[in-house]
Protein backbone atom coordinates (compact mmCIF):
# COMPACT_ATOMS: atom_id res chain seq x y z
CA UNK A 1 0.00 0.00 0.00
CA UNK A 2 1.09 3.50 -0.64
CA UNK A 3 0.40 6.66 1.30
CA UNK A 4 -0.62 9.80 -0.48
CA UNK A 5 0.25 13.28 0.65
CA UNK A 6 -3.11 13.49 2.34
CA UNK A 7 -2.20 10.48 4.45
CA UNK A 8 -4.96 8.25 3.10
CA UNK A 9 -4.05 4.72 2.17
CA UNK A 10 -5.24 3.48 -1.18
CA UNK A 11 -4.56 -0.05 -2.28
CA UNK A 12 -5.47 0.58 -5.94
CA UNK A 13 -2.78 3.14 -6.64
CA UNK A 14 0.22 1.91 -8.65
CA UNK A 15 3.41 3.89 -8.76
CA UNK A 16 4.27 5.26 -12.24
CA UNK A 17 7.71 3.61 -12.13
CA UNK A 18 6.02 0.25 -11.57
CA UNK A 19 3.79 0.88 -14.57
CA UNK A 20 6.80 1.73 -16.72
CA UNK A 21 8.71 -1.38 -15.65
CA UNK A 22 5.65 -3.57 -16.17
CA UNK A 23 5.02 -2.04 -19.59
CA UNK A 24 8.62 -2.55 -20.70
CA UNK A 25 8.75 -6.11 -19.44
CA UNK A 26 5.39 -7.08 -20.87
CA UNK A 27 6.29 -5.65 -24.28
CA UNK A 28 9.56 -7.57 -24.26
CA UNK A 29 7.79 -10.73 -23.13
CA UNK A 30 5.13 -10.34 -25.81
CA UNK A 31 7.85 -9.96 -28.41
CA UNK A 32 9.66 -13.01 -27.08
CA UNK A 33 6.45 -15.07 -27.07
CA UNK A 34 5.71 -13.95 -30.63
CA UNK A 35 9.23 -14.88 -31.73
CA UNK A 36 8.93 -18.27 -30.07
CA UNK A 37 5.59 -18.89 -31.79
CA UNK A 38 7.07 -17.86 -35.15
CA UNK A 39 9.99 -20.22 -34.59
CA UNK A 40 7.65 -23.07 -33.72
CA UNK A 41 5.61 -22.48 -36.87
CA UNK A 42 8.70 -22.38 -39.06
CA UNK A 43 10.05 -25.47 -37.30
CA UNK A 44 6.81 -27.32 -38.02
CA UNK A 45 6.99 -26.31 -41.70
CA UNK A 46 10.61 -27.42 -41.92
CA UNK A 47 9.75 -30.77 -40.36
CA UNK A 48 6.97 -31.28 -42.91
CA UNK A 49 9.30 -30.38 -45.78
CA UNK A 50 12.01 -32.71 -44.47
CA UNK A 51 9.49 -35.56 -44.20
CA UNK A 52 8.42 -35.00 -47.80
CA UNK A 53 12.05 -35.01 -48.95
CA UNK A 54 12.79 -38.12 -46.89
CA UNK A 55 9.80 -39.98 -48.34
CA UNK A 56 10.73 -38.91 -51.86
CA UNK A 57 14.31 -40.13 -51.42
CA UNK A 58 13.07 -43.37 -49.89
CA UNK A 59 10.79 -44.04 -52.88
CA UNK A 60 13.58 -43.18 -55.31
CA UNK A 61 15.98 -45.51 -53.52
CA UNK A 62 13.44 -48.31 -53.62
CA UNK A 63 12.94 -47.81 -57.34
CA UNK A 64 16.66 -47.71 -58.04
CA UNK A 65 17.63 -50.76 -56.01
CA UNK A 66 14.53 -52.90 -56.34
CA UNK A 67 15.75 -55.81 -58.46
CA UNK A 68 12.28 -57.18 -59.08
CA UNK A 69 11.70 -54.29 -61.50
CA UNK A 70 14.84 -55.27 -63.36
CA UNK A 71 13.92 -58.92 -63.68
CA UNK A 72 11.83 -58.54 -66.84
CA UNK A 73 14.38 -56.23 -68.41
CA UNK A 74 17.22 -58.62 -67.59
CA UNK A 75 15.33 -61.56 -69.06
CA UNK A 76 14.66 -59.62 -72.23
CA UNK A 77 18.28 -58.55 -72.43
CA UNK A 78 19.45 -62.15 -72.00
CA UNK A 79 17.09 -63.24 -74.76
CA UNK A 80 18.44 -60.53 -77.06
CA UNK A 81 22.03 -61.55 -76.26
CA UNK A 82 21.27 -65.13 -77.22
CA UNK A 83 19.72 -63.99 -80.48
CA UNK A 84 22.72 -61.79 -81.25
CA UNK A 85 25.11 -64.65 -80.47
CA UNK A 86 23.10 -66.94 -82.72
CA UNK A 87 23.14 -64.37 -85.52
CA UNK A 88 26.89 -63.88 -85.11
CA UNK A 89 27.56 -67.59 -85.39
CA UNK A 90 25.31 -67.81 -88.44
CA UNK A 91 27.10 -64.88 -89.98
CA UNK A 92 30.47 -66.51 -89.31
CA UNK A 93 29.35 -69.76 -90.90
CA UNK A 94 27.96 -67.92 -93.93
CA UNK A 95 31.16 -65.97 -94.24
CA UNK A 96 33.21 -69.17 -94.14
CA UNK A 97 31.04 -70.68 -96.87
CA UNK A 98 31.37 -67.55 -98.92
CA UNK A 99 35.14 -67.57 -98.52
CA UNK A 100 35.30 -71.25 -99.53
CA UNK A 101 33.18 -70.58 -102.60
CA UNK A 102 35.42 -67.71 -103.59
CA UNK A 103 38.49 -69.89 -103.24
CA UNK A 104 37.00 -72.52 -105.52
CA UNK A 105 36.37 -70.05 -108.25
From Swiss-Prot:
InterPro entries linked to this entry: Snapin/Pallidin/Snn1 (IPR028119)
Main location group: other
Keyword entries, A-Z: Coiled coil, Endosome, Transport
Cellular compartment(s): Endosome
Keyword field contains Transmembrane: no
Pfam families in alphabetical order: Snapin_Pallidin (PF14712)
Residue stretches in coiled coil: 70-105
Cellular-component GO terms for this entry: endosome
Superkingdom, taxonomy of origin: Eukaryota
Similarity remark: Belongs to the SNAPIN family.
Subunit structure, interactors included: Component of the biogenesis of lysosome-related organelles complex-1 (BLOC-1).
Role of this protein: Component of the biogenesis of lysosome-related organelles complex-1 (BLOC-1), a complex involved in endosomal cargo sorting.
Protein name: Biogenesis of lysosome-related organelles complex 1 subunit SNN1
Amino acid sequence: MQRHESGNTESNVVHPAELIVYSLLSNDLDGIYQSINDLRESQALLILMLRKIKNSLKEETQLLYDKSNWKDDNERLDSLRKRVDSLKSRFQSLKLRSDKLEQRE
